[in-house]
Amino acid sequence: MNLNSIPAFQDNYIWVLSNNEGRCLIVDPGEAAPVLNAIKEKNWQPEAIFLTHHHHDHVGGVKELLQHFPHVVVYGPAETQDKGTTRVVKDGDSALVLGHEFSIFATPGHTLGHICYFSHPYLFCGDTLFSGGCGRLFEGTASQMYQSLKKISALPDDTLICCAHEYTLANMKFALSILPHDSFINEYYRKVNELRAKNQITLPVILKNERKNNIFLRTEDPDLINEINKETKLQQPEERFAWLRSKKDSF
């Protein structure tokens, strides 16, 4: 299997998973033009589309793509029914695409109906987890997002996190504002800074590393607890997550 990223809009990535025969899966096509260009260049044959949630920058290209490839099956949560979805899926469902079975699990927080798709090692997580960060809470609660991130963090160490935005540098600047002396965060910030200076993608990332570099996955870490306690005393990791998310919103 070959993993490809297609830049879209200002900072989106549309992920495409293709096999050696050229059949492919497209994830969260927010616009059609860059996908159609890549299909022509690579001679891909689209088989399916995965949608993680209903926001326009993830679904805006679906209907145009279906005009070109009407046979394609579009998987998505109920909140995407009017966006071109032809097969509504929910937590606990699975999808057989390109000969691989993808498990589907609910990750509410960014939106209430947000879902993720996982077939080892690939995780298509939309706007739930970013490298160094997590999605804004547009519809769900901090508690819901915390539980969603716990689900992702429990996946195998070598899981490839294929998230939908190039937010890594900004996320790591925020992380440094919270844990300025953390060796993992400083090292990763330097690496990300170098990549972005060359306009190179920072994704996908390996979950094992993300657990070290992403403060939103470290709410039980003693160093982070000590830093948060300098400003406020919070007993539960879920409360610490909510505090971090609120700080990031105004960073």
UniProtKB/Swiss-Prot annotation:
It comes from the Bacteria. Pathway: Secondary metabolite metabolism; methylglyoxal degradation; (R)-lactate from methylglyoxal: step 2/2. Binds 2 Zn(2+) ions per subunit. InterPro entries: Clx_II_MBL, Glyoxalase_II_hydrolase, HAGH_C, Hydroxyacylglutathione_Hdrlase, Metallo-B-lactamas, RibonucZ/Hydroxyglut_hydro. Zn(2+) 2 binds at residues 57-58, 127, 165. Keywords: Hydrolase, Metal-binding, Zinc. It catalyses: an S-(2-hydroxyacyl)glutathione + H2O = a 2-hydroxy carboxylate + glutathione + H(+). GO terms for molecular function: hydroxyacylglutathione hydrolase activity; metal ion binding. Zn(2+) 1 binds at residues 53, 55, 110, 127. It is an enzyme of class 3 (hydrolase). Gene3D superfamilies: Ribonuclease Z/Hydroxyacylglutathione hydrolase-like. Its EC number is 3.1.2.6. Its cofactor is Zn(2+). GO terms for biological process: methylglyoxal catabolic process to D-lactate via S-lactoyl-glutathione. Signal peptide: none annotated. Monomer. PANTHER family: HYDROXYACYLGLUTATHIONE HYDROLASE, HYDROXYACYLGLUTATHIONE HYDROLASE GLOB. Belongs to the metallo-beta-lactamase superfamily. Glyoxalase II family. Thiolesterase that catalyzes the hydrolysis of S-D-lactoyl-glutathione to form glutathione and D-lactic acid. This is Hydroxyacylglutathione hydrolase. It comes from Citrobacter koseri (strain ATCC BAA-895 / CDC 4225-83 / SGSC4696). The gene is gloB.
